[in-house]
């Protein structure tokens, strides 16, 4: 089971993880993060769940997780970039996640474009990037 205290103790970041929220079960970490942001208007927050029963994928696809078998998280950042650079996040974020997992656990993961994380020819995860323009600032 995920340990939020251990996570926060070992988190070494400047922007992401300033405030973390953990839920044993949730409908969608993405929905949670936008709802939290509406209240406090601060970027750098992370939402982590042990189980998700209404996650979204591309299009109308649903993403379900098994309790104690998945890492489900969303983070929200505020960045200054042009509309042309916005598309780079769709490439760089999944690449960074796969690289980080490879370096941490030493498993050979791959990326099936645009957002599927593959291990042993099976999809084990996905990356969903949502952006919103709020008060002329882009949040991801």
Regions found by a protein language model. Give the residues of each.
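N-terminal lobe of the biotin/lipoate ligase/transferase fold
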Residues: 1-103
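Structural motif
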Residues: 19-20, 44-46, 110, 125-126, ...
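Alpha-helix termini
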Residues: 68-70, 134, 139
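Acidic (Asp/Glu) carboxylate-rich active-site/surface patches
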Residues: 99-136
């Amino acid at each position: 089971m995920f340990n939020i205290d251990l996570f926060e103790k070992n988190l070494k970041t400047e922007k992401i993880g300033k405030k973390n929220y953990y839920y044993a079960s949730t409908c969608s970490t993405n929905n949670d993060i936008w709802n939290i942001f509406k209240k406090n208007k601060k970027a750098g927050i992370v939402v982590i769940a042990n189980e998700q029963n209404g996650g979204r994928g591309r299009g109308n696809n649903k993403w379900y997780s098994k309790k104690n078998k998945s890492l489900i998280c969303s983070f929200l950042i505020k960045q200054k970039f042009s509309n042309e650079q916005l598309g780079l996040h769709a490439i760089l974020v999944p690449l960074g996640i796969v690289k980080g997992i490879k370096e941490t656990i030493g498993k050979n993961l791959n990326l099936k474009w645009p957002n599927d994380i593959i291990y042993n020819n099976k999809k084990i995860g996905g990356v969903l990037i949502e952006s919103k323009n709020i008060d002329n600032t882009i949040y991801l």
